[in-house]
Amino acid sequence: MRGVAICVLLLSLIPGNAAGSAARQETVDRIAARVENDIILLSDIRALSRYQQFVDGKSESDAQILDRLIDQWIVRIEAGVARFPRPFDAEIEHSLERVRTSFPSTEEYEARKKQSGLSDAEMREMVSAQLYLSDYLDSRFRAGVQIDPKTIEDFYQKSVVPMAKSRGQEAPTLEAARDSIQEALVQRGINDQADRWLIESKARLHIEKLLDEATK
């Protein structure tokens, strides 16, 4: 579940100038969903859409993003109840650096960031929240994921070797790739368990989606 790593920015509404006429004021935000006694705003969807556009060069539909935000709400509430610690500044900086180095060049990173409209503060908040949620899910589900040697070998033969051949490269040895394969399979297992947990959690919650009304 890749969705679950991304922050929810509750952007404040900026009041209009008191000296201005009522006709000049306009609604700048709407409620996209109610989850229990909380709300998710249309601006939250827009913020996550901009972040996806920045990281991936494209974004999901509003409905898909809303589902991700509901998932994030559940994880955030559970992490809060568990008093799960927030990431340290050094961890946030490391994650930000990983985002930067995922681009071919600094120029492309800056250009994409400018295109998305994200400020440095918004970027940091997004990355911090993503790290917090993903770390909580890791701590909750990792111990329950067991990977046997046969599964690692199968993944090596069916995924690693063919991918290397398709790129005209020599595949690493199984032993050289073992740790990386195991971690990838553990992450897949965490995602699978988290997905099942989220489905069960949503079934117990009062969730009212108002996205169609919010976009009118």
What are these regions (language model features)?
Residues 16-23:
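Signal peptide processing junction and immediate N-terminal pro/mature segment
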Residues 24, 28-31, 39, 60-216:
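Peptidyl-prolyl cis-trans isomerase
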Residues 43:
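His/Glu-rich zincin catalytic helix
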